């Protein structure tokens, strides 16, 4: 190997003797595997849950058209062995969050290198490397931007030392009643897809929100309208899916309900339109009269790239009808009770969302978007740049060589910019920060305070929204610190399922209660202090108090770096990654890697999930004996739906 021959003898020996774990075999992963074997690393393990898609072939050079549909990790191994047959590579087509890959598994490796595309997996690998005591090199790209950083237990910040920007969400009443931006209509259209063809979610309702406080002159009327009963003369409410089924998914009836009747109903909430331009209902018949029919555009007749053309309203109405018919047939083929899953690469599903979103944009007087733009926003996409991946993968190897040579103090967080900074540098290195003493992951005794309403939060919400989603646990076990060792949540299948729909107050949890949450897979324990509040904001289930930890003085970066947000164009640009970070939605390639960790000087965030990860199986470990929860007083508990 030419490269290893140029290294100092001690470093070359360390390279030959090391065993590396590469997590991810996508854009960065392909480049990284090539760089590693050409540098002299021959003992590698690579893991990736994904399979090869046609859209990967323009930049993930280890894959060819004949490989589409196969495991990325396995094909990457085969391709690398063709030009480096002496390498020993083990490939895993699996999720790194599988309990099989426990702390002992991670301890086999000299170091781990992340080439991931989602925050949940990054959090998990961060914790596993901390537990195993091995260095981790984190990386990410987003378009022309990139970042590499080193994480070492007790020496540097971990991936979670600095809080990541929270997911961008929109109030339900904005989505349902008063959209003001194209993204609001696109989110509504995705919700509509699930309400009609997929898994129904009460939080994704698309019908006008009659409980919108802004729509009522008297604030008390909002609650009254929301709770109106059939006796009061209200029409009996049925779900959107039930209604659609009753019509046989008739495209014209669906169109008139969604874009005419619901809009007319919104207009009756006249207070909403005092300072807004009112929506204009659409009528199927008027769009398809003789005059408008002549204006319907045939996509095949459009010049240029058809997905980048904006059609007229009549054409989007026609596209809506055709996509509904296609999706209806897909449901019928799957049988009774079947559900469809929205995928940006599924043509009928993408056509449906494009048509529905644009029709709603037109109704609310917004400029309509091309299918390409809708797909970018709905699928959280930033075009991936192969050169960026190549540069970042090279930097990963350089940082790895510093670690193997024993010069961890020389490691840097390096940002790749879109344009040179004032010092004409594209690559900007910054000193690594020490561990954050307030970090709820790598602190000696991780502890956090969570503000919530104990009479509204259920055990299921505690497990899914707080422990798994917010604190990135995989298989949490929760014990109430009540002197009895009451087990509230167990990762053993079925052991505490009966608790799921009960409010946590029913277990004696109140203000100042303490919960100990353990994830035995991650070798991670978090002490949670409960701060009860009866006055949580609307649509806010909980709040982490002091989520932004105080940091001590920082070392000045070796090069100044401007703080960047999506869409800025002020020179240096190291950052973007979460599709939720700004009002016009920061778009990230859901198929690609994105900048991974935040920094005081540079806003680098993590990418969106590529897919819903499978539920992990229960973790085998020694568990405390479950003690039945107290069934005592339900003192003044108010059960709220």
Swiss-Prot record:
GO terms for cellular component: cytoplasm; SUMO activating enzyme complex. InterPro entries: ThiF/MoeB/HesA (IPR045886), ThiF_NAD_FAD-bd (IPR000594), UAE_UbL_dom (IPR028077), Ub-E1_IAD_1 (IPR042449), Ub_act_enz_dom_a_sf (IPR023318), Uba2 (IPR030661), UBA2_C (IPR032426), Ubiquitin-activating_enz (IPR035985). One of its GO terms (molecular function) is transferase activity. The active site is at 173 (glycyl thioester intermediate). Residues 562-579 have a biased composition (Polar residues). Residues 546-641 are annotated as: Disordered. Its main location: nucleus. Residues 582-594, 630-641 have a biased composition (Acidic residues). Its EC number is 2.3.2.-. Pathway: Protein modification; protein sumoylation. Transmembrane segments: none annotated. Keywords: ATP-binding, Metal-binding, Nucleotide-binding, Nucleus, Transferase, Ubl conjugation pathway, Zinc. It is found in: Nucleus. Residues 548-561 have a biased composition (Basic and acidic residues). GO terms for biological process: protein sumoylation. The heterodimer acts as an E1 ligase for sumo1, sumo2, and sumo3. It mediates ATP-dependent activation of sumo proteins followed by formation of a thioester bond between a sumo protein and a conserved active site cysteine residue on uba2/sae2. Belongs to the ubiquitin-activating E1 family. Heterodimer of sae1 and uba2/sae2. The heterodimer corresponds to the two domains that are encoded on a single polypeptide chain in ubiquitin-activating enzyme E1. Interacts with ube2i. This is SUMO-activating enzyme subunit 2-B. The gene is uba2-b.
């Amino acid at each position: 190997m030419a490269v290893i021959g140029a290294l100092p003898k001690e470093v070359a020996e360390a390279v030959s003797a090391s065993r590396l774990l590469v997590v991810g075999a996508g854009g960065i992963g392909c480049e990284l595997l090539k760089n590693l074997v050409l540098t002299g690393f021959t003992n590698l393990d690579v893991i990736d849950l994904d399979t090869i898609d046609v859209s990967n072939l323009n930049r993930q050079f280890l894959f060819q058209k004949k490989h589409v549909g196969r495991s990325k990790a396995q094909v990457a191994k085969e391709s690398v062995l063709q030009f480096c047959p002496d390498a020993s590579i083990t490939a895993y087509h699996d999720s790194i969050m599988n309990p099989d890959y426990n702390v002992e598994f991670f301890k086999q490796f000299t170091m781990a290198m992340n080439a991931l595309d989602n925050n949940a997996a990054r959090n998990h690998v961060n914790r596993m490397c901390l537990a195993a005591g091995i260095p981790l090199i984190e990386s990410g790209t987003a378009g022309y931007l990139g970042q590499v950083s080193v994480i070492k237990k007790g020496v540097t910040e971990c991936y979670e030392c600095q809080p990541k920007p929270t997911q961008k969400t929109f109030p339900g009443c904005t989505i349902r009643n008063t959209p003001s931006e194209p993204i609001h209509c696109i989110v509504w259209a995705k919700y509509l897809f699930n309400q009609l063809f997929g898994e129904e979610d009460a939080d994704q309702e698309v019908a006008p929100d009659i409980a919108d406080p802004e729509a009522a002159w008297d604030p008390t009327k909002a609650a009254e309208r929301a709770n109106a009963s059939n006796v009061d003369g209200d029409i009996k409410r049925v779900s959107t899916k039930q209604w659609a089924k009753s019509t046989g998914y008739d495209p014209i009836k669906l169109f008139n309900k969604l874009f005419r009747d619901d809009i007319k109903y919104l207009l009756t909430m006249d207070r909403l339109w005092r300072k807004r331009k009112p929506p204009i209902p659409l009528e199927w018949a008027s769009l398809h009269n003789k005059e408008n029919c002549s204006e319907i555009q045939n996509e095949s007749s459009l010049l240029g790239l058809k997905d980048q053309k904006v059609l007229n309203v009549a054409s989007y109405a026609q596209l809506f009808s055709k996509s509904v018919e296609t999706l209806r047939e897909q449901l019928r083929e799957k049988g009774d009770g079947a559900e469809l899953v929205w995928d940006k690469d599924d043509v009928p599903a993408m056509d449906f969302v494009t048509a529905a979103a644009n029709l709603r944009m037109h109704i609310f007087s917004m400029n309509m978007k091309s299918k390409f733009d809708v797909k970018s926003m709905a699928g959280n996409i930033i075009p991936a740049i192969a050169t960026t991946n190549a540069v970042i993968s090279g930097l990963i190897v350089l940082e790895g060589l510093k670690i193997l040579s024993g010069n961890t103090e020389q490691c840097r967080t390096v940002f790749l910019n879109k344009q040179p900074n004032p010092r004409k540098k594209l690559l900007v290195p910054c000193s690594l920060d020490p561990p954050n003493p307030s970090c709820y992951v790598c602190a000696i005794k991780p502890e956090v305070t969570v503000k919530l309403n104990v009479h509204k939060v259920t055990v299921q919400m505690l497990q899914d929204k707080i422990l798994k989603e917010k604190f990135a646990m995989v298989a949490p076990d929760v014990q109430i610190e009540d002197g009895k060792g009451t087990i509230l949540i167990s990762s053993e299948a079925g052991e505490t399922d009966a608790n799921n729909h009960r409010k946590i107050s029913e277990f004696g949890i109140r203000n100042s209660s303490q919960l100990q949450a353990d994830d035995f897979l991650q070798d991670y324990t978090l002490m949670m202090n409960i701060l009860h509040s009866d006055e949580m904001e609307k649509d806010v289930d909980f709040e982490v108090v002091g989520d932004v930890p105080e940091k001590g003085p920082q070392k000045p970066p070796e090069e100044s770096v401007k703080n960047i947000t999506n869409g800025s164009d002020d020179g240096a640009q190291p950052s973007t990654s979460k599709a939720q970070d700004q009002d016009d939605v920061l778009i990230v390639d859901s198929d690609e890697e994105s900048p991974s960790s935040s920094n005081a000087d540079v806003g680098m965030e993590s990418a969106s999930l590529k897919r819903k990860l499978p539920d992990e199986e229960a973790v085998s470990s020694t568990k405390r004996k479950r003690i039945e929860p107290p069934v005592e007083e339900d003192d003044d508990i108010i059960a709220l739906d």
